[in-house]
């Protein structure tokens, strides 16, 4: 499970308490978990989670449904926003499930993606349950969560069926809830490479 996925591999924001003079330069995406942990930072506004699922035996597993569980909603902390990019884009927008964490009963909504890298854009079909996976045919689930009103603790519950029985897989941050916080109105900083510092 990857919980620090950036849009287009370069666009993301974190909310952190330290002032800009105490925060190191932005990392590359692969180093984001360690960077965020060192700053005690949380995802600002949005969080993208990717989970790779596959079977373990000779048979296939049917993924039946995926549900969002919001465990807590708090007032967003009055911290600073640190932008990991000064603007970037990409030709590929993956298909995903999106969810509004502010909704009273958050529901995942499938959204189609697109690949505009060629002469003609190609639509990537929206994901849909049920899905069948096996050891040889994995599936990557992408969830894009957003909030404008809370400091949210949340997780995902995946229901599955296999020849051996049924079950529910909890998807979280190594036993802890995932955490995404609204950042509306907070001071936002981008990294000024020429000056080697964060600036508004």
Where are these regions (language model features)?
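Short, hydrophobic/aromatic beta-strand segments
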Residues: 59-67, 77-80, 109-112, 155
């Amino acid at each position: 499970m990857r919980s620090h996925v950036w849009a287009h591999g370069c666009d993301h924001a974190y909310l952190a308490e330290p002032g800009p003079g105490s925060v190191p330069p932005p990392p590359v995406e692969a180093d984001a978990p360690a960077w965020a942990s060192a700053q005690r930072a949380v995802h600002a506004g949005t969080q993208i989670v990717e989970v790779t699922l596959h079977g373990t035996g000779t048979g296939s597993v049917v993924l039946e449904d995926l549900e969002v569980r919001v465990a807590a909603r708090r007032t967003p902390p009055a911290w600073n926003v640190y932008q990991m990019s000064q603007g970037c884009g990409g030709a590929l927008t993956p298909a995903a499930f999106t969810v509004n964490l502010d909704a009273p009963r958050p529901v995942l909504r499938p959204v189609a993606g697109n690949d505009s890298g060629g002469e003609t854009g190609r639509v990537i079909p929206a994901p849909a349950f049920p899905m069948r996976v096996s050891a040889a045919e994995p599936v990557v689930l992408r969830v894009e969560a957003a909030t404008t009103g809370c400091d949210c603790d949340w997780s995902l519950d995946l229901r599955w069926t296999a020849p051996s029985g049924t079950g529910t897989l909890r998807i979280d941050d190594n036993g802890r809830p995932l955490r995404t916080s609204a950042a509306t109105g907070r001071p936002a900083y981008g990294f000024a490479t020429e000056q080697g510092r964060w600036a508004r």
